[in-house]
Amino acid sequence: MAGNFLKYDGPLTVADLPVDAHEFIALCAPRPVFISGGATNGDGWVDAKGMFMAAAAAGPVYKLLGRKDLGTTVFPPIETPLIDGDIAFRQHTGGHTPAPNWPTFLEFASRYLHAPESTQAK
């Protein structure tokens, strides 16, 4: 196991990590990032609003590099895709699974990934 991982293994809290999620997202700039999750269902494993806030906070780095951010800092209603920028976000009602966001991810990714004509469906 990586030695640095052991520093954060155990009874530590979020405040013990020396970086925040928006900094990790900003490190991806200027590359596209799709952030998705299910609605919070009381299990404590999903923090959709926190995910959104991190995506929005990474926006200035994307803009600095000439790319588009989320386009808003207002948390959207569930099932509302924000996919016009280079950072994308969508929250679904399907629980703790990525499957309901796949169609939206594919729509977002299609702007960046182009299949050769011979492999495209006709």
Residue ranges of predicted features:
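Hydrophobic alpha-helix feature that most strongly marks membrane-spanning transmembrane helices
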Residues: 28-29, 33, 38, 63-67, ...
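Short, proline-enriched alpha-helix->beta-strand connector loops that line the catalytic pocket
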Residues: 27-33, 82-87
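N-proximal short alpha-helices
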Residues: 24-27, 78
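Mobile cap/lid helix-loop segments that gate and shape the active-site cleft of serine hydrolases
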Residues: 1-24, 47, 51-74
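C-terminal catalytic histidine-bearing segment of alpha/beta-hydrolase fold enzymes
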Residues: 56-57, 62-122
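Aromatic-enriched hydrophobic runs in primary sequence
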Residues: 14, 21-25, 32-33, 53-56, ...
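Conserved strand-to-loop "acid loop" that flanks and positions the catalytic carboxylate
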Residues: 29-48, 91-95
